[in-house]
């Protein structure tokens, strides 16, 4: 029991020395019992201290109960998955609430949208701006693996499950992924230094030290760093020229810094030296030992 300064025995809910306690109609302190509150909720008071429980769970007569921050007791639900049909899956926690966001359940890294629906076969944007992809069947976050979303669109999830972007070295291959994470294949990518590289149409590997074509008989050359060359180049002993897009010049002229022109063979792309050539304008021009020719106005 507890008596106040006037000697009155206290009853009902009381706060004494910072502890929330409860005394029944006779004034006896309640311990190890449920109490019905005036607002229709229920609270529970500790069996030893008599203090109202908050932010915890308890088991009484084999039943599990949850206690919130205000001390309101509710019967615990059994956590588990459930479906509403149409392959929509949810997970209810011990309070019976649908979980949302990133969750680790039974060792699986899963994700549930704002409505609680489990994400399967879809991308999710993480808090740091990166993206992750969740398996079509299990819903598990993909980690350290390539995956495709159809239409030959390939991606790679790193060891944290983040979909990579930009230049990457994976299993010894030099690959590139666009800003959405889609792997670049059979296309150019712009490097940080402004140069361009080309990635193989099947493997996605960056082409290095090789000629290649992008179709329509347009030829390019990737140097030892995998950068597409531009301007005048000597490759395998041949004097060649590539325009500012990297396309090899064939059957056409290029203007030199001193105002002279050079001509590059229509078949081999080799610079014309010590010979006459009828250039595309119809004029005949002689190209000297340096491969330079001059056109009269």
Go through the PLM ranges and name each one.
Residues 1-297:
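Extracellular adhesion/carbohydrate-binding repeat motifs centered on closely spaced tryptophans
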């Amino acid at each position: 029991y507890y008596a106040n300064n006037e000697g009155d025995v206290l009853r009902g809910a009381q706060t004494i020395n910072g502890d929330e306690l409860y005394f029944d109609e006779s004034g006896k302190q309640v311990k190890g019992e449920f109490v019905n509150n005036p607002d229709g909720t229920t609270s529970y008071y500790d069996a030893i201290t008599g203090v109202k429980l908050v932010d915890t769970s308890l088991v009484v007569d084999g039943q599990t109960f949850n206690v919130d921050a205000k001390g309101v007791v509710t019967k615990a639900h059994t956590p588990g998955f459930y479906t509403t049909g149409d392959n929509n899956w949810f997970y209810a926690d011990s309070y019976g609430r649908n979980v949302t966001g990133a969750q680790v359940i039974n060792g699986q890294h899963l994700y549930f949208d704002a409505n609680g629906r489990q994400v399967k076969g879809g991308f999710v944007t993480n808090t740091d701006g990166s993206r992750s992809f969740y398996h079509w069947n299990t819903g598990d976050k993909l980690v350290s693996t390539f995956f495709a979303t159809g239409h030959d669109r390939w991606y790679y999830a790193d060891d944290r499950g983040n979909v990579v972007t930009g230049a990457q070295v994976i299993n010894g291959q030099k690959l590139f992924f666009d800003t959405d994470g889609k792997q670049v294949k059979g296309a150019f990518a712009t490097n940080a230094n402004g140069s361009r590289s080309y990635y193989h149409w099947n493997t996605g590997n960056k082409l290095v030290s090789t000629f290649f074509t992008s179709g329509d008989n347009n030829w390019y050359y990737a140097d030892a760093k995998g950068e597409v060359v531009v301007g005048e180049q000597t490759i395998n002993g041949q004097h060649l020229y590539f325009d500012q897009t990297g396309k090899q010049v064939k059957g056409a002229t290029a203007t030199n810094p001193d105002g002279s022109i050079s001509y590059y063979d229509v078949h081999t792309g080799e610079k014309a030296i010590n010979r006459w050539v009828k250039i595309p304008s119809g004029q005949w021009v002689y190209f000297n030992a340096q491969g330079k020719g001059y056109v009269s106005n």
